[in-house]
Amino acid sequence: MQHLVLIGFMGSGKSSLAQELGLALKLEVLDTDMIISERVGLSVREIFEELGEDNFRMFEKNLIDELKTLKTPHVISTGGGIVMHENLKGLGTTFYLKMDFETLIKRLNQKEREKRPLLNNLTQAKELFEKRQALYEKNASFIIDARGGLNNSLKQVLQFIA
């Protein structure tokens, strides 16, 4: 079994689904944003504000290469922009948690949106969402309809890997 890599826009449920998959499959769960945040000693928002998005993307790219060296399979929850990296290919089986923009925004309360620097301006966030759609689809081994909630997404992933 390869790594199971969850991709999708912020708020699509990657972190929650990763935890459930880890429990169901008895695999360790890794969260790329959390790993970067812990290593740098700043939240993702603080990294963007203090070090810039380019530095965050460099940390992300380096982490992908590092994760490729792990010998045992993991469930990997990724940040929404990870699909911008060519080296994502070969990390594992990727599942795109697809959801429309309006549903994503409804799922995130104000406190959650404040933690996500790229959601500061909803017009710009929607443009970013639309730009990334093709990248998510291009990088996906499987597309998961994430509008049906966590249990439905979990069932879909488990069916694909059965």
Swiss-Prot record:
Keyword Transmembrane: no
Known EC number: 2.7.1.71
Enzyme superclass (EC): transferase
GO cellular component entries: cytosol
Top-level taxon: Bacteria
S-S bridge residues: none
InterPro entries hit by this protein: P-loop_NTPase (IPR027417), Shikimate/glucono_kinase (IPR031322), Shikimate_kinase/TSH1 (IPR000623), Shikimate_kinase_CS (IPR023000)
Keywords, alphabetical: Amino-acid biosynthesis, Aromatic amino acid biosynthesis, ATP-binding, Cytoplasm, Kinase, Magnesium, Metal-binding, Nucleotide-binding, Transferase
Binding, Mg(2+): 15
LID domain: region residues: 109-123
Listed cofactors: Mg(2+)
Biological processes annotated in GO: amino acid biosynthetic process; aromatic amino acid family biosynthetic process; chorismate biosynthetic process
Cellular compartment(s): Cytoplasm
Family matches, as Pfam families: SKI
Cross-referenced CDD domains: SK
Residues bound to ATP: 11-16, 116
Job description of the protein: Catalyzes the specific phosphorylation of the 3-hydroxyl group of shikimic acid using ATP as a cosubstrate.
Family assignment from sequence similarity: Belongs to the shikimate kinase family.
Cross-referenced PANTHER family: SHIKIMATE KINASE (PTHR21087), SHIKIMATE KINASE 1, CHLOROPLASTIC (PTHR21087:SF16)
Subunit and partners: Monomer.
Protein name: Shikimate kinase
Species: Helicobacter pylori (strain ATCC 700392 / 26695)
